[in-house]
Each structure stands twice: as structure tokens, then as C-alpha cells.
UniProtKB/Swiss-Prot annotation:
This is Chaperone protein DnaJ. Zn(2+) 2 binds at residues 174, 177, 200, 203. NCBIfam families: DnaJ_bact, PRK10767.1, PRK14282.1. One of its GO terms (biological process) is protein refolding. Homodimer. GO terms for molecular function: ATP binding; heat shock protein binding; unfolded protein binding; zinc ion binding. One of its GO terms (cellular component) is cytoplasm. The keyword Flavoprotein does not apply. Pfam families: DnaJ (PF00226), DnaJ_C (PF01556), DnaJ_CXXCXGXG (PF00684). The gene is dnaJ. InterPro entries: DnaJ, DnaJ_C, DnaJ_domain, DnaJ_domain_CS, HSP40/DnaJ_pept-bd, HSP_DnaJ_Cys-rich_dom, HSP_DnaJ_Cys-rich_dom_sf, J_dom_sf. It is found in: Cytoplasm. Residues 7-73 form the J domain.
Amino acid sequence: MKREKKDYYEILGVPRNATQEEIRKAYKRLVKEWHPDRHPENRKEAEQRFKEIQEAYEVLSDPQKRAMYDRFGYVGEQPVYQEAETGGSFFEDVFREFENIFNRDIFDVFFGEESGRRERREYARRGEDIRYTIEVNLSDLINGTEIPIEYERYETCPRCGGTGVEPDSGYISCPRCGGTGRIREEKRSFFGYFVSERTCDECGGTGRVPQELCHECGGSGRVLRRVRRTIKIPPNIEDGGHLRIPGGGNAGYYGGPYGDLIITVRVRSDSRFKRSGKDLIYDITIDYLQAILGTTVEIPLPEGGTTMLKIPPGTQPETVFRLKGKGLPGEYGRRGDLLVNVHVEIPKNLSREERKVLEDLAKKRGIPVA
């Protein structure tokens, strides 16, 4: 069958020694000039001319295809299966050669993502989540608190409504793929020609492109804004806990929903207390005479203020007193306890008078001392 020879240089109106930049400029000018939407009265002729321009650019923009065209006058398909004179099995050579040509596995092309679906750029996608860290005081966990924050996020472009298209301009068929959403690739090897299809990188597989990109967002459909928001911190959150604010993240793509704002809460350490779940531990040191005779001490509370704790006579070192409901809020709002750990200080040095009083007391009680 005789091949139809076409002068691709003549179709694009460029000389045979034209640079890639000259070819690209000619192509862009011609696809705009001959787009079928611009010739409703001669649409059929325009479509044919448009396809020829597309075909010419497809060949001349590819160095390998252009070299073959310059040499043979056409770019066509040859039988793929030829006798291999290399070591190893025939199919191993085929697979190896295929990978060298396309830079990907043969199964990825024929059975993977490239063959099974069309990856569209302009489908609605959810926006990204944004992560933000807030620090709170221990006292903020008693009744909860509200903290104002300020952060940057992408919002839906108010000019184009997220479409990325300049208002009133609309869409046109993709000039690169001719509206099909697919690009056909031919690669030559010593086995012959391999032909594959891939998603058009110009339109993302949709077959159409904006006639004019939005002047405000540049076609992304999103604009960066600084926003303010008040975050409500619940009373029972743990250190390192997370809060999810639905819709507080970045705007979606092409009408997709907003992502979420994820807050990580860090509780500042309080030197007065140690945490044990919902309980708080407070250490206090009293004099040995207070432990013997009893006393009343002032205990700070995590929410602020103080309470009085009565230490009974004869309190032993490391005695723990439990103040119920004075800890941190737990499930259903029930608070943990405040545990007061009493340390007793024994003096290392005594005055002569103090020592005599204690020696007399020991003698009366029959306690041997040094």
C-alpha cells in the first residue's frame, strides 16, 4: 500500500532547517487560526486542516520522528516482531528494549495506569489539610479556653469561582491533542515501532483548555489569603492531642471541598505540678515539728487560687493526701484528683537548746540516743 507523503514543513510554513522554537511558534499561531470553533461556516475543512497541523507538529517537535521523516519522507508503523540476534530469550529482549525506549515497564503502559484510565487534571479534588500547633497553659485545661490564631491558606478564587478560567472566556478544544485527551507516541527500536498512548500533558486528559486563564489566580482556581480564626480548646484534651476543624484547610481544586485545619495542642509544663493522667501531683516539704505536732498548709490549685490542707499530728514522711476533684477534667467533665505528697525535713544541725529538749524527751520515752 502506497504511503501518503505530506510536507509537514509546508503545513507549518517553516523551512526544513527550522529550530524547535520556530516550529513551536508556527504551531501555536496556526492552531489558533484554524481552530474549528473559529470557522463555523467551514468547520469540516477547518477540522481537517487542524488535524494536519497537529500531525505535522507531532512529528517535527519530536527529534526522533523528525529525523525519520527527513530521511524517509514519512513516519509510519513497521512490524514489531523481528528476529532478534541477541543473547537471551526473544521476549526478554523485547521487554528490555521496550523499557529502554519508553523509560517505563511494558506492563505499566499496556496494563497499568496509562491504559486503564485517563488521569484528568480538571476533576474536583479536595484541598490539602493544614497543620497548626497551639500552646496552652495547664490552667487552660480546667475549663477550656478560646485562642485566636492567624495563618495562611488557599481560598477559592473570587474572580473565577475556582474554575481557573477568565469569566466569559470559556473553553476551547485542546490544541495539542485535538480534543481527544490522549497523545499517541511512536518509538523506533531494532524490533520495529512501538506505539503507545498517554494522557495529554496540555489538557490533563480533558480534551479542552481554557481560552483565557483567570487574571487573578493565573488558572489555579485558588488564591493565597491570610485568615484569622478562634480555636476552642476543650478542657479534657491531652498534651499532643489533635483537633480537626472541618473546612479550615486549603480550598479544593475545580470545585472540590476545602481540606481541614488540624490543630496540635501542646500543654506548657507547670513547675508546680506533675501529671499522672487526669491526676496532678504536688510536692510539699514541712518541718519535722509540723509533722509531729500537725499544721495547716496552703496548696495552689491548677485553675488558680489556693486551698488549705490540714496536716494531722504524727504525719509520716511521704504521706499522700488526696484532694478529690481538684485535678484535670476527664471524660464527661469529671475531674481527677490533686495528690499532695508530703516530705518531712529533718534538720542536720540543732542548737544546744533544741538538742537538750529532744534529749530530755528521748530520756522520758526510754529512747536511746547518742
